Amino acid sequence: MKYLHFFRSHLAGFSFAEEVFVFDQLKIWTELQLVLEPENPYDAHAVALYFKKTKIGYIPRVNNKEISKLLEAGYADLFTAKINRISPEEDPENQIGVVVFLKVKGKK
């Protein structure tokens, strides 16, 4: 499958989630699931990122408005998110880098 770059960012909220239990399992290019959280009390456009069944953080607020609208409209299958940077020595909010891609259907 071919992918088009949509945006790149750090993983927000990393220090508040359950990620400490899965940090050692995270690798470069690990695929993450994008999950819309419209009832999030802190951000109506919140998009959580999951590794397997563990929430490890969020798409930062500065990047989430467009993608949250597309997820809400039912286009979740067009996106994939992958870890592109792991820096354990950094502050928790900057330890994980994520890139979101658009999947190009029918192309390899």
For the regions a language model picked out, list residue spans one by one:
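Conserved active-site motif detector
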Residues: 1-108
